[in-house]
Amino acid sequence: MIIAKNIEQFNLLRESFTKDRKIGFVPTMGALHNGHICLIKKAKSENDVTIVSIFVNPTQFNNPNDYQTYPNQLQQDIQILESLDVDILFNPSEKDIYPDGNLLRIQPELEIANILEGKARPGHFSGMLTVVLKLLQITKPDNLYLGEKDYQQVMLIKQLVKDFFIKTKVIVCSTQRQATGLPLSSRNKNLTSADIEIANKVYEILRQDNFLDLEELTNKINSTGARTEYIQKINNRIFLALYISKVRLIDNFLKETGPSC
């Protein structure tokens, strides 16, 4: 695996290493888990060259503490990527991605950008879309691999690719879960053993619920020691965000299936 630490290094690789070859791209913020690994394996199976980026994007954090406490395990991540035979790791600095500061941003006007996560985390989707556009302009992949857990993010990135005429196919992979139903997330690394017990209780409730009375469901979840930020049903999909201690977790799933593995 070749590691490109800045855009200049990456551009040299892009010109020599990827010419006339199909490129798959998996953008991450590091702290890799099996959800990322599934995306990477799919990318490798469908492309000639697989590129993974690790960049913790400061502009998509509306809470400075969340940014400061986001898990960082770069050396472990590198070992994981090497074991998966990833071709290129793009690991730029903030200065590389925002050389003149955050002067221009994508500001989504879609309804989906202003509800749920958009409402709970002002500026989050603007920062996310801005960095994704930058990464796509740099990597120029044929295929982009995303996880369904970040459902709103996926929908907005699809619109970004369409509206800016980007020649990249967006491929969405199903949410990877633990046996309890808890979705895999980098933030799970910040959960203590006591927090995990609470999370398991929450997902036991979710697996058994029929989602007809969301107020009652909210009360049940809060009784475990978790703190619900929102639970909403849109069309036939359940969206939720909750805190366990100081760790914020999000999820979504179809009403019929629940948070099944």
UniProtKB/Swiss-Prot annotation:
ATP binds at residues 29-36, 147-150, 184-187. One of its GO terms (cellular component) is cytoplasm. It comes from the Bacteria. (R)-pantoate binds at residues 60, 153. InterPro entries: Cyt_trans-like, Pantoate_ligase, Pantoate_ligase_C, Rossmann-like_a/b/a_fold. It catalyses: (R)-pantoate + beta-alanine + ATP = (R)-pantothenate + AMP + diphosphate + H(+). It is found in: Cytoplasm. Keywords: ATP-binding, Cytoplasm, Ligase, Nucleotide-binding, Pantothenate biosynthesis. One of its GO terms (molecular function) is pantoate-beta-alanine ligase activity. Beta-alanine binds at residue 60. It holds the Pfam family Pantoate_ligase. The keyword Cytoplasm applies. Pathway: Cofactor biosynthesis; (R)-pantothenate biosynthesis; (R)-pantothenate from (R)-pantoate and beta-alanine: step 1/1. HAMAP family: PanC (MF_00158). Catalyzes the condensation of pantoate with beta-alanine in an ATP-dependent reaction via a pantoyl-adenylate intermediate. This is Pantothenate synthetase. It comes from Francisella philomiragia subsp. philomiragia (strain ATCC 25017 / CCUG 19701 / FSC 153 / O#319-036).
